[in-house]
């Protein structure tokens, strides 16, 4: 073989190899909780497995818990936007005032206690009110968790007055507004900081879901767990599962279609359902540990809901001052919730 022929052959082989391997994509997704908690167990890992299976192995999704790739939970959105990671789990509330329209879904007694139903509402609401806010990333799913529960040292909450003076961790601005209105001292912090804050006495307890209680060792760090009566959650929290926009748009069409097939309403409800599954497990584990499991009376729940309504009105006024139509946002969130009730 002449040198020129050899070079041409080698170049052709190289081009073929490059073309072949160019179709293989590894996506690094990051989150900030234990891999044993509900969302990674029942949504993230099955979602990653589905992507790999449907692509015949051409897409591999690697999941990194506990922010192992760097950064912190509050700046996860920016890590995705800037390409430091390919994708991840974002709680917009961890950056207060940056995504204010998302807070409508987090207001007191806004959603049902079904994470799946609430997540369907979240996806619908997101399409109308939040896609411009998230234009710098590619949103795969928008979802909520199950009902927020009050976990604390000492006896369970029985009356509204029992909140007075308690130092309670809150995950979002609406949640901390509610805790303050109830008489507690709210301390905002991301979930990874909660166990240490409990163990050091920085907080007396906090509000979070049942499903997070095992991985946070709340069976050891708290004594009681209190929910409100009825079908509506005390509060909820909004999440997105998102990709770097350039990474998504740079994928071959057929592989991007696989991401699309596992996105949207289906993926959002899947993520919410993961929290429902985890909530049942977490509640049972707290009960098995001997902790006190309590539900407020309907009368006390009504008193707390009345305080929650005042918080919602205060939020509407704040949004109006920022140039939004706060009442319209609340009405839209309520409509999305009502439209997605499954019963």
Where in the sequence are the language-model features?
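Absolute protein N-terminus
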Residues: 1, 22-23
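Bacterial N-terminal signal peptides that target proteins for export
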Residues: 1-8
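Hydrophobic helical h-region of N-terminal Sec-dependent signal peptides
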Residues: 8-16
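Sec/Tat signal peptide C-region and signal peptidase I cleavage site
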Residues: 16-22
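Core domains of carbohydrate- and sulfate-ester-processing enzymes
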Residues: 121-122
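Basic phosphate/pyrophosphate-binding loop/patch that engages nucleotide-derived ligands
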Residues: 126
